[in-house]
A protein has these predicted regions:
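Conserved alpha-helical "signature site"
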Residues: 1-246, 268, 280
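C-terminal accessory extensions/subdomains outside the catalytic/core fold
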Residues: 252, 258-261, 266-278
Length: 281
Protein backbone atom coordinates (compact mmCIF):
# COMPACT_ATOMS: atom_id res chain seq x y z
CA UNK A 1 0.00 0.00 0.00
CA UNK A 2 1.54 3.31 -1.08
CA UNK A 3 1.91 6.14 1.38
CA UNK A 4 -0.05 9.39 1.15
CA UNK A 5 1.82 12.67 1.07
CA UNK A 6 0.51 15.69 2.93
CA UNK A 7 0.30 17.46 -0.43
CA UNK A 8 -2.03 14.73 -1.73
CA UNK A 9 -4.21 15.03 1.36
CA UNK A 10 -4.33 18.83 1.07
CA UNK A 11 -5.28 18.45 -2.58
CA UNK A 12 -8.41 16.58 -1.51
CA UNK A 13 -9.61 19.35 0.81
CA UNK A 14 -11.30 21.17 -2.06
CA UNK A 15 -13.50 18.10 -2.58
CA UNK A 16 -14.89 18.15 0.96
CA UNK A 17 -18.51 19.11 1.64
CA UNK A 18 -19.06 22.86 1.48
CA UNK A 19 -19.72 24.45 4.84
CA UNK A 20 -22.79 26.68 5.20
CA UNK A 21 -21.91 30.27 4.30
CA UNK A 22 -22.75 31.53 7.76
CA UNK A 23 -20.32 29.02 9.27
CA UNK A 24 -17.44 30.19 7.07
CA UNK A 25 -18.26 33.78 8.00
CA UNK A 26 -18.30 32.88 11.69
CA UNK A 27 -14.94 31.14 11.37
CA UNK A 28 -13.46 34.24 9.75
CA UNK A 29 -14.80 36.36 12.63
CA UNK A 30 -13.06 34.47 15.47
CA UNK A 31 -10.27 37.01 15.85
CA UNK A 32 -12.09 40.11 14.65
CA UNK A 33 -13.12 42.94 16.95
CA UNK A 34 -15.22 44.86 14.42
CA UNK A 35 -17.87 42.17 14.04
CA UNK A 36 -21.51 43.23 13.67
CA UNK A 37 -23.44 41.10 16.13
CA UNK A 38 -26.79 42.04 14.63
CA UNK A 39 -25.70 41.18 11.11
CA UNK A 40 -24.34 37.79 12.13
CA UNK A 41 -27.44 37.04 14.17
CA UNK A 42 -29.57 37.76 11.11
CA UNK A 43 -27.46 35.46 8.94
CA UNK A 44 -27.62 32.61 11.45
CA UNK A 45 -31.37 33.08 11.76
CA UNK A 46 -31.76 32.56 8.02
CA UNK A 47 -30.50 28.99 8.42
CA UNK A 48 -33.40 27.30 10.16
CA UNK A 49 -31.60 24.03 10.93
CA UNK A 50 -28.61 25.76 12.51
CA UNK A 51 -30.87 28.12 14.42
CA UNK A 52 -32.93 25.24 15.82
CA UNK A 53 -29.86 23.30 16.97
CA UNK A 54 -28.26 26.37 18.51
CA UNK A 55 -31.37 27.34 20.45
CA UNK A 56 -31.96 23.77 21.64
CA UNK A 57 -28.44 23.57 23.01
CA UNK A 58 -28.58 27.08 24.47
CA UNK A 59 -31.76 26.13 26.34
CA UNK A 60 -30.41 22.79 27.54
CA UNK A 61 -28.83 22.12 30.92
CA UNK A 62 -25.49 22.64 29.18
CA UNK A 63 -25.78 26.35 29.97
CA UNK A 64 -28.27 26.25 32.84
CA UNK A 65 -30.16 29.38 31.80
CA UNK A 66 -32.91 30.59 34.11
CA UNK A 67 -35.08 31.79 31.23
CA UNK A 68 -35.66 30.35 27.77
CA UNK A 69 -34.08 32.10 24.79
CA UNK A 70 -36.18 32.09 21.63
CA UNK A 71 -34.01 33.90 19.08
CA UNK A 72 -30.35 34.01 18.10
CA UNK A 73 -30.24 37.65 19.21
CA UNK A 74 -31.41 36.63 22.67
CA UNK A 75 -28.90 33.77 22.76
CA UNK A 76 -26.05 36.15 21.96
CA UNK A 77 -27.28 38.63 24.58
CA UNK A 78 -27.47 35.94 27.29
CA UNK A 79 -24.58 33.61 26.39
CA UNK A 80 -22.28 36.00 24.57
CA UNK A 81 -21.06 36.01 20.99
CA UNK A 82 -18.19 33.58 21.62
CA UNK A 83 -20.49 30.85 22.95
CA UNK A 84 -23.05 31.19 20.18
CA UNK A 85 -20.34 31.31 17.53
CA UNK A 86 -18.86 28.07 18.89
CA UNK A 87 -22.27 26.37 18.92
CA UNK A 88 -23.23 27.43 15.39
CA UNK A 89 -19.80 26.55 13.99
CA UNK A 90 -19.88 23.14 15.64
CA UNK A 91 -23.42 22.34 14.50
CA UNK A 92 -22.65 23.46 10.95
CA UNK A 93 -19.51 21.35 10.62
CA UNK A 94 -21.15 18.25 12.06
CA UNK A 95 -24.11 18.73 9.72
CA UNK A 96 -21.76 18.88 6.74
CA UNK A 97 -19.97 15.64 7.63
CA UNK A 98 -22.69 13.68 9.39
CA UNK A 99 -22.91 10.25 7.82
CA UNK A 100 -21.18 8.29 5.14
CA UNK A 101 -20.80 4.95 3.50
CA UNK A 102 -18.59 2.02 4.38
CA UNK A 103 -17.69 0.42 7.66
CA UNK A 104 -16.44 3.58 9.38
CA UNK A 105 -18.47 4.42 12.49
CA UNK A 106 -19.42 8.06 11.82
CA UNK A 107 -21.85 8.12 14.74
CA UNK A 108 -19.17 6.89 17.11
CA UNK A 109 -16.71 9.40 15.69
CA UNK A 110 -19.00 12.33 16.44
CA UNK A 111 -19.91 10.96 19.86
CA UNK A 112 -16.24 10.98 20.79
CA UNK A 113 -15.82 14.45 19.23
CA UNK A 114 -18.76 15.94 21.15
CA UNK A 115 -17.56 14.33 24.38
CA UNK A 116 -14.08 15.76 23.87
CA UNK A 117 -15.54 19.21 23.16
CA UNK A 118 -17.54 19.13 26.40
CA UNK A 119 -14.60 17.83 28.41
CA UNK A 120 -12.21 20.39 26.89
CA UNK A 121 -14.60 23.23 27.74
CA UNK A 122 -14.84 22.02 31.34
CA UNK A 123 -11.06 21.65 31.64
CA UNK A 124 -10.51 25.07 30.06
CA UNK A 125 -12.77 26.69 32.63
CA UNK A 126 -10.62 25.32 35.44
CA UNK A 127 -7.35 26.04 33.62
CA UNK A 128 -8.52 29.57 32.76
CA UNK A 129 -8.22 29.10 29.01
CA UNK A 130 -10.66 30.29 26.35
CA UNK A 131 -13.57 27.87 26.78
CA UNK A 132 -15.07 28.36 23.32
CA UNK A 133 -11.74 27.81 21.55
CA UNK A 134 -11.35 24.68 23.67
CA UNK A 135 -14.85 23.49 22.71
CA UNK A 136 -14.28 23.94 18.96
CA UNK A 137 -10.77 22.47 19.12
CA UNK A 138 -12.07 19.49 21.07
CA UNK A 139 -14.85 18.92 18.58
CA UNK A 140 -12.47 19.05 15.60
CA UNK A 141 -9.39 17.37 17.08
CA UNK A 142 -9.83 14.21 14.97
CA UNK A 143 -11.31 15.90 11.89
CA UNK A 144 -8.31 14.80 9.82
CA UNK A 145 -9.51 11.23 10.23
CA UNK A 146 -12.68 12.12 8.31
CA UNK A 147 -10.58 13.49 5.46
CA UNK A 148 -8.58 10.28 5.32
CA UNK A 149 -11.52 7.89 5.62
CA UNK A 150 -13.70 9.71 3.06
CA UNK A 151 -11.03 10.67 0.52
CA UNK A 152 -8.68 7.67 0.85
CA UNK A 153 -11.07 4.87 1.86
CA UNK A 154 -9.04 1.95 0.50
CA UNK A 155 -5.86 3.11 2.18
CA UNK A 156 -7.69 3.72 5.44
CA UNK A 157 -9.12 0.21 5.41
CA UNK A 158 -5.49 -0.91 5.36
CA UNK A 159 -4.84 1.32 8.39
CA UNK A 160 -7.65 -0.36 10.32
CA UNK A 161 -6.43 -3.81 9.28
CA UNK A 162 -2.89 -2.94 10.40
CA UNK A 163 -4.12 -1.71 13.78
CA UNK A 164 -6.07 -4.91 14.32
CA UNK A 165 -3.22 -7.17 13.24
CA UNK A 166 -0.42 -5.62 15.31
CA UNK A 167 -2.53 -4.28 18.19
CA UNK A 168 -1.39 -0.65 18.04
CA UNK A 169 -3.32 2.61 18.27
CA UNK A 170 -4.75 4.39 15.23
CA UNK A 171 -2.08 7.09 15.20
CA UNK A 172 0.68 4.49 14.97
CA UNK A 173 -1.24 2.56 12.32
CA UNK A 174 -1.76 5.69 10.22
CA UNK A 175 1.93 6.53 10.32
CA UNK A 176 2.96 2.97 9.50
CA UNK A 177 0.61 2.56 6.54
CA UNK A 178 0.11 6.09 5.21
CA UNK A 179 3.28 7.88 6.26
CA UNK A 180 1.26 10.65 7.90
CA UNK A 181 -1.46 10.89 10.54
CA UNK A 182 -4.86 12.45 11.11
CA UNK A 183 -3.45 15.22 13.32
CA UNK A 184 -1.31 16.52 10.44
CA UNK A 185 -4.22 16.37 8.02
CA UNK A 186 -6.59 17.93 10.55
CA UNK A 187 -4.31 20.89 11.05
CA UNK A 188 -4.13 21.36 7.28
CA UNK A 189 -7.93 21.33 7.10
CA UNK A 190 -8.23 23.87 9.93
CA UNK A 191 -5.80 26.08 8.05
CA UNK A 192 -7.79 25.57 4.84
CA UNK A 193 -10.96 26.64 6.68
CA UNK A 194 -9.06 29.65 8.09
CA UNK A 195 -9.56 28.84 11.76
CA UNK A 196 -7.42 30.85 14.21
CA UNK A 197 -3.84 29.60 14.47
CA UNK A 198 -4.44 28.52 18.08
CA UNK A 199 -7.17 26.09 16.97
CA UNK A 200 -5.04 24.86 14.07
CA UNK A 201 -2.22 24.18 16.51
CA UNK A 202 -4.48 22.43 19.02
CA UNK A 203 -5.73 20.06 16.32
CA UNK A 204 -2.25 19.39 14.98
CA UNK A 205 -0.66 18.73 18.38
CA UNK A 206 -3.44 17.14 20.40
CA UNK A 207 -1.48 13.87 20.64
CA UNK A 208 1.84 15.49 21.53
CA UNK A 209 1.65 19.03 22.96
CA UNK A 210 4.84 21.03 22.59
CA UNK A 211 6.58 23.12 25.25
CA UNK A 212 4.76 26.26 24.16
CA UNK A 213 1.45 24.38 24.46
CA UNK A 214 1.71 23.79 28.20
CA UNK A 215 -1.17 25.35 30.10
CA UNK A 216 -2.88 26.25 26.81
CA UNK A 217 -5.60 24.88 24.51
CA UNK A 218 -3.48 22.10 22.92
CA UNK A 219 -2.78 20.64 26.37
CA UNK A 220 -6.46 20.97 27.29
CA UNK A 221 -7.53 19.02 24.18
CA UNK A 222 -4.76 16.45 24.71
CA UNK A 223 -6.06 15.68 28.21
CA UNK A 224 -9.73 15.84 27.19
CA UNK A 225 -9.17 13.34 24.38
CA UNK A 226 -7.68 10.81 26.80
CA UNK A 227 -10.41 11.34 29.40
CA UNK A 228 -13.20 10.80 26.87
CA UNK A 229 -11.50 7.68 25.51
CA UNK A 230 -11.34 6.41 29.09
CA UNK A 231 -15.03 7.15 29.59
CA UNK A 232 -15.75 5.27 26.32
CA UNK A 233 -18.49 7.70 25.34
CA UNK A 234 -18.18 6.61 21.70
CA UNK A 235 -18.99 3.01 22.62
CA UNK A 236 -15.72 1.58 21.29
CA UNK A 237 -14.81 -0.95 23.95
CA UNK A 238 -11.62 -2.02 22.12
CA UNK A 239 -10.29 1.52 21.67
CA UNK A 240 -6.98 2.24 23.37
CA UNK A 241 -6.82 5.10 25.86
CA UNK A 242 -3.98 7.40 24.78
CA UNK A 243 -1.36 8.23 27.38
CA UNK A 244 -1.44 11.70 28.92
CA UNK A 245 1.84 13.59 28.84
CA UNK A 246 2.72 14.37 32.44
CA UNK A 247 3.93 17.90 31.71
CA UNK A 248 0.72 18.69 29.82
CA UNK A 249 -1.40 17.45 32.71
CA UNK A 250 0.66 19.29 35.33
CA UNK A 251 0.45 22.52 33.34
CA UNK A 252 -3.33 22.66 33.74
CA UNK A 253 -3.13 22.77 37.53
CA UNK A 254 -6.34 20.82 38.14
CA UNK A 255 -6.78 19.23 41.56
CA UNK A 256 -8.63 15.93 42.26
CA UNK A 257 -11.88 17.71 43.14
CA UNK A 258 -11.72 19.67 39.89
CA UNK A 259 -11.07 16.51 37.91
CA UNK A 260 -14.11 14.84 39.44
CA UNK A 261 -16.16 17.86 38.40
CA UNK A 262 -14.84 17.55 34.85
CA UNK A 263 -15.90 13.90 34.72
CA UNK A 264 -19.33 14.72 36.14
CA UNK A 265 -19.93 17.68 33.81
CA UNK A 266 -18.84 15.75 30.73
CA UNK A 267 -20.99 12.71 31.46
CA UNK A 268 -24.05 14.64 32.61
CA UNK A 269 -24.20 16.87 29.53
CA UNK A 270 -23.04 14.33 26.96
CA UNK A 271 -26.25 12.60 25.86
CA UNK A 272 -28.20 15.84 25.48
CA UNK A 273 -25.46 17.72 23.63
CA UNK A 274 -24.74 14.74 21.40
CA UNK A 275 -28.40 14.29 20.51
CA UNK A 276 -28.77 17.96 19.59
CA UNK A 277 -25.52 18.48 17.70
CA UNK A 278 -25.70 15.26 15.67
CA UNK A 279 -29.41 15.51 14.81
CA UNK A 280 -30.02 15.42 11.08
CA UNK A 281 -32.26 18.49 11.20
Amino acid sequence: MSAITLEQAVGKLRDLPTLPLVVTELISSFERTDISVGELAAKVSNDQALTAKTLRLANSSFYGLQCKVRTIDQAIAVLGLDSVRALVTSAGIIGSFNGGAGAFDFAGFWRHAVGTALCAKSLARLARCNQEYAFVSGLLHDIGRLVLITRFPTQYEAVIAHRNSVDCDMLQAERAVLGLDHAMVGRALAEHWKFPVLIQHAIGHHHAPMAQDLGAIPSVVHVADAIVHALDLAGHADERVPAIAQDAWNSLGIDPAGLRRVFEDTESEFDNACQILTASN
